A protein has these predicted regions:
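P-loop NTPase catalytic core of nucleic-acid-dependent motor ATPases
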Residues: 1-98, 168-170, 216, 220-225, ...
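Walker B catalytic acidic pair
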Residues: 106
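Short coil/turn segments at secondary-structure boundaries
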Residues: 26-31, 44-47, 131-135, 218-220, ...
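Phosphate-handling catalytic cores of nucleic-acid transaction enzymes
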Residues: 209-249
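A eukaryotic nuclear recognition-module signature that targets compact all-alpha binding cores
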Residues: 247-262, 278
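Positively charged interface segments
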Residues: 61, 65-91, 111-115, 129-136, ...
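Signature of the SF2 helicase/ATPase Hel1-core->accessory helical subdomain module
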Residues: 119-123, 169
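Loop/turn-to-beta-strand initiation segments
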Residues: 98-101, 126, 142-146
Length: 330
């Protein structure tokens, strides 16, 4: 009927504004549709990023309204704390049985992701939790899409592929502002960027969401019948996720910034690279550096096997003030 068509037009308008990139928009439709199948086949942890009023919270509210009791929210501490002692009550895990969409609010700057718990929550293996005062542990296979809304990304120290293949960063690039701010930004020439559009905020949008639920659900049912719940990656999400990984992976950062291919006669001695790495790490992280054995393992993974306590065909990039040391390092 006409009312449903009008609501569909409103939803389409919302999606086009919040996700101006068409490939990303399709990705997010598929992501929302996947919550309906009751099986976590994608095994992803999707992190919604973006500063200010960009539609993140409205998007989460809409999915929560659609799913009702099948959606839940958890405390960020569940993913940032160390594992609890075995046998203690874990009601925050027990309550996730049967959920289809689980969201959390942002970590504080510098909060470190507990990769083990994240893998448990996004994997296809059994989890177990015990409700408060319950005698028995509750075992279940996670069925939910795990998401987080944040301006601050987690610190992730893991370099293993099992962690990073699960993480997807979705940038919310639109901005919704008050009318007076819109006019200011317009005068500054900031309005009109298709990649990062700016719109006047709809102050009644949140009130419209309950009336959208029926049509939104119908769209997703039609969608999931086509996709089977599979969410195919899109370039924008993969690029953002790769940038995140490279920033977090200090090993890769160190190698990219400090080691370059040279002539066959060039070589990097183990002692030289260890000293250079220790200085670089302490400068950047103000902490005790990892063991030398970890450094050598990462170098073998990334630039190849050593021979005679050196890596041949590569050289260390020193800062300008270190150039004299470089000349005399051998």
């Amino acid at each position: 009927n006409q009312q449903q068509l009008d609501i569909k037009a409103e939803i389409d308008d919302f999606m086009e504004k919040v996700f101006p990139n068409e490939e990303l928009r399709e990705y997010m439709w598929d992501h929302a549709a996947s919550t309906l199948i009751g099986e976590n086949i994608n095994q992803k942890f999707i992190i919604y990023t973006g500063v200010g009023g960009n539609g993140k919270s409205i998007w989460v509210d809409l999915i929560n309204l659609m799913l009702g009791d099948y959606a839940d929210k958890i405390n960020i501490a569940l993913l940032t704390q160390k594992r609890k002692s075995i046998g203690g009550p874990t009601p925050e895990i027990a309550k996730l049985k049967g959920r289809r969409f689980v969201s959390m609010d942002e970590p504080s700057a510098g909060d470190e992701l507990n990769e083990g718990i994240m893998k448990q929550m996004t994997g296809g293996d059994e989890m177990e939790g015990r409700a408060m005062y319950a005698k028995k542990m509750l075992k279940f296979v996670p069925q939910f899409e795990l998401t987080c809304c944040t301006n601050h990304l987690f610190t992730i120290k893991s370099t293993d592929k099992g962690t990073w293949r699960r993480i997807r960063q979705v940038d919310f690039r639109a901005e919704f502002v008050d009318p007076e701010d819109y006019e200011i930004k317009k005068a500054q020439g900031l309005v009109g960027d298709k990649d990062r559009p700016i719109y006047v905020k709809d102050l009644k949008l949140k009130d419209k969401l309950p009336s959208w639920v029926e049509v939104f659900t119908a769209i997703l049912i039609e969608r999931v019948n086509e996709t089977g719940g599979i969410v195919r990656d899109c370039p924008m999400v993969l690029e953002a996720s790769k940038r995140y990984e490279e920033k977090e992976n200090f090993w890769r950062q160190f190698i990219n910034e400090n080691i370059v291919k040279g002539t066959p006669d060039d070589k990097i001695k183990k002692n030289d690279i260890r000293n250079h790495f220790n200085e670089w790490y302490q400068t950047n992280y103000q902490q005790k550096p990892p063991k030398s054995s970890e450094l050598y393992e990462q170098l073998e993974k990334n630039i190849g096997k050593q021979r005679n306590r050196a890596w041949y065909g590569y050289r260390i990039v020193y800062e300008a003030y270190d150039s004299e040391e470089e000349d005399g390092s051998d």
